[in-house]
């Protein structure tokens, strides 16, 4: 994960002239990109998870999480230092990242970074680039305020980030390939197929049951 974010994302954001990329989603309504930007032990967004990627002048990318955790230190957890009442916060005077407080903090971040372009995952053609749900988009655009005029659609950013692999991933892919070949070999062997009796549907169901 860290290798992809370190080596793949900066080049893509530069190529597509994206100064900021925002991924915002709610629990069990994740963006398709979600599983490519979080640790493998993270199975769902946390209430609302907002990940913000900002391109720095030197070409590197700042990675901030506004809810959703740091994913083992891959992200910096962006927190507000503004005092809030115990009722609104976590009991210790710190703002809890949920609801309006989360959006206010997001607005602070955008104002501070002042990006010329903000990429959101909205696209009518590419499913992998259309992960911003309708209600989430409305809330996000309200939070952006005047910065909504800087929103751009760049579907290639999400698609290419999901698609590009780094060398460290290849050994695992070879293991997956070996597993697939082993399953297919058994599916079409006499261990599963009885000539004259076994149907193609039988084989399909065997495969479904085997991989679940």
Across the structure, where does each feature detected by a protein language model lie?
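A composition/biophysics-driven feature that prefers long, compositionally simple stretches
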Residues: 1-212
